[in-house]
């Protein structure tokens, strides 16, 4: 059974139109400083790899803090398309300059639906459409804002999120157990 819904652009469901991160150098991780989210910290599946966590010492970093319902996208290089939907359980982060932030409007869509949509084959096929041969294409904020997104009804979005969240939460617990066992 095919779901009824509508196609929208990312810009249609966001509060902002895509904001580039802070252009600052990373420094060794210091819990007294703000954690710095870089492209290299984001895995292809949208989870974080903080084994080489860094901080940022720039006083302007406060203006680049991720907030609930924010999603960031990698815009360049072999990581183009990687994305991370901010989860406060991961800690506080300022996002780096090679990331583009969009703030999802919860009045228009279940923001976590967008998190999962941006891990779908539909999303990754859209990203791949910018590739040229073996080179991943760059995607700027304007292009990301035009990204097509299929929106089922809010009820269906909530149902999809409920299922995906239960799987994500289980993976998160398993990863913590694995980290504990390998420590």
PLM regions and their residue ranges:
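Short coil/turn segments at secondary-structure boundaries
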Residues: 23-31, 129-131
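Well-ordered mid-protein domain cores that form the structural environment of catalytic cofactors
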Residues: 119-128, 148-150
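Sequence-specific dsDNA recognition surfaces
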Residues: 7-26, 35, 40-71, 86
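A short glycine-rich beta-alpha junction/loop motif
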Residues: 93-99, 112, 132-161
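Short amphipathic beta-strand starts and helix->beta connectors
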Residues: 86-87, 130-133
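Non-catalytic DNA-recognition/assembly elements of restriction-modification systems
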Residues: 1-20, 146-183
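A short beta-sheet element
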Residues: 38-39, 59-119
